[in-house]
Amino acid sequence: RPGGSVQTINNALARGQNLLLTPGVYAIDRTIEVKRPDTVVLGMGHATLTSVGGAVPMAVADVPGVVIAGVTFDAGTQLSPALLRVGTAHANHGIAARRSVTDPTTLSDVFVRVGGPHVGKVTNAVEVNSDHVIIDDAWIWRADHGIEGFTNGVNGDTDRWNTNTGLNGLVVNGDDVTATGLFSEHFQHFSTLWNGNGGTVVMYQNELAYDPPTQADWTQPNGTLGYPGYKVADGVTSHHLYGGGVYAFNENNPSIHTASGFEVPDTPGVLLHHVFTICLSGPGTIDHVVNDTGGTAGAATVSQRQVVVDYP
């Protein structure tokens, strides 16, 4: 329950106990470490783990069978590198990866919030490094509105852009990761960045950031206009997305352009099915749907979906 120490929680987890989080907001000043296979972490009533002092609220080791369900992860006022981390980056997963084929780690009904009720700061909101992880219903949200008291810009958006910082929403480095019902929104770089091979996503929803003050703020270092709502890294050779939408609503600067809603490598093993972009209510433009393919979603096509049935 709220008020319990992370050390007490970690001691119990190390003894092989599962973790039940009762309703409430937990101030987490060090990482809850899930290290044993087949551990269950279950939140009730939107139990919320709020980072304190830049802590990563929860980290899962490279072990099979862990279940994280019904938990909300909340960024704090000091920058966290992540809010939920699964597995070790750049690790040789070895035996753990082989076991996880039949006993995968699962993230179910997981919610992530950066800003809204208070200032929030994170680099990568959710980082998945283990192989074969299943993500079943996740909403990863950098706040497009809140009660922080911001005033500069439309609805305080310029203050929000400079204060509620969140670079990337979901970063997947593991192989053979599957997501069903994935929502990731409003991040300042990539809302979803998929670096691993063999990924599969069924139903993806994204709204691009509402709040970039200028096009320069919303331009990649290589000069590409904006950041796609769904990015598969250039070195990936196998990936499937079934059903995805990326929306633009650049209320803070209607002249903002985003080059494409989805950006993927042109290779035979990377396939997208039934994806679209759309401009909501007018402000902002997405020039193409996937890479350089598909129509423009902008002021001339407000509320009209620009659809690519299959890519390539």
Name each region found by the language model.
Residues 1-312:
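Extracellular/periplasmic carbohydrate-active domains that bind, remodel
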